[in-house]
Amino acid sequence: MASVSPSSLLLLFFALLSPLLPLTSALVFREYIGSQFNDVKFSDVPINPDVDFHFILAFAIDYTSGSSPTPTNGNFKPFWDTNNLSPSQVAAVKRTHSNVKVSLSLGGDSVGGKNVFFSPSSVSSWVENAVSSLTRIIKQYHLDGIDIDYEHFKGDPNTFAECIGQLVTRLKKNEVVSFVSIAPFDDAQVQSHYQALWEKYGHQIDYVNFQFYAYSARTSVEQFLKYFEEQSSNYHGGKVLVSFSTDSSGGLKPDNGFFRACSILKKQGKLHGIFVWSADDSLMSNNVFRYEMQAQSMLASVNSRDRAMYWSLL
């Protein structure tokens, strides 16, 4: 019987093990979709196979529908364009693109022209209702994750931290979702709530979708990098994703140096991913998803380099 060298056994071990090992350095591209009911579909958005791609359905809200929406204490329902972004369409895009995952975002800025408030009756009742209603929606729509985007609050920071923290902990424990993100921006009230959540439950949060487009439209590359460092400090240890919008809001736009800033962060090893608000706006713009393709191409180049380094070590 021929002998097998230790080095051959080691190579065989790594070859068998490698499909099970995640590429923890893989960068993620994320895009919000569905809030504006302008018939945008998953298939409209270009998807690079070499990035981890997340669609984020905007939004699920714990409010009644109708002309005068009111809070429902954690009883969520879909408020995105469910005709074009249905359960079957979620399943289809995930079947077609193995690198795609789909999550839903909670809250958002407004519904029916009025602010959406985080407004729990109590921590326990809100959490119970939220776990039940969101589990049902997530399973119905074949979703993978959840994003927290409340922007207005009637509860104090500690109540917000406990409600959201307990919710995401239970959803992960029950294997309903595999990842969680939060979407704060630079506003004193918003930051006080999200930083309280981060302090208590940051270990449950996988991505920080920081809304850098909420800064001034006059933001320079240097200012953008300064803001990134500030928010990386505020959410210490978190994967803070950089962002731009394709609507008329502010921040550092792609034409004004966004990708230059990303290149600097990439060289520093600080670029964790990019997210965009939103596919709805991109569909209607003159640049129809041009910047999404550019962002994914940048991220894919980093991922390809890291994969090459990974295999060279085997």
From Swiss-Prot:
Q: Which InterPro entries match?
A: Chitinase-like, Glyco_hydro18_cat, Glyco_hydro_18_chit_AS, Glycoside_hydrolase_SF
GH18 domain mapped to chain residues = 27-296
Q: What EC number(s) are associated with this protein in UniProt?
A: 3.2.1.14
Which keywords does UniProt give here?
A: Carbohydrate metabolism, Chitin degradation, Chitin-binding, Glycosidase, Hydrolase, Polysaccharide degradation, Signal
Domain of life the protein comes from: Eukaryota
Q: Which PANTHER family match?
A: 2, PUTATIVE, EXPRESSED-RELATED (PTHR46476:SF13), CHITINASE 2-LIKE (PTHR46476)
The entry's active site is 151
Q: Residues of the signal sequence?
A: 1-26
User: Which CDD domains does the protein's record reference?
Assistant: GH18_narbonin (cd06544)
Name this polypeptide is given: Chitinase 1
Keyword Disulfide bond tagged: no
Which organism's genome codes for this protein? Tulipa saxatilis subsp. bakeri (Tulip)
Give the UniProt record's GO annotations in the biological process aspect: chitin catabolic process; polysaccharide catabolic process
GO MF, one term, reads: chitin binding
The task this protein performs is described as: Able to cleave glycolchitin.
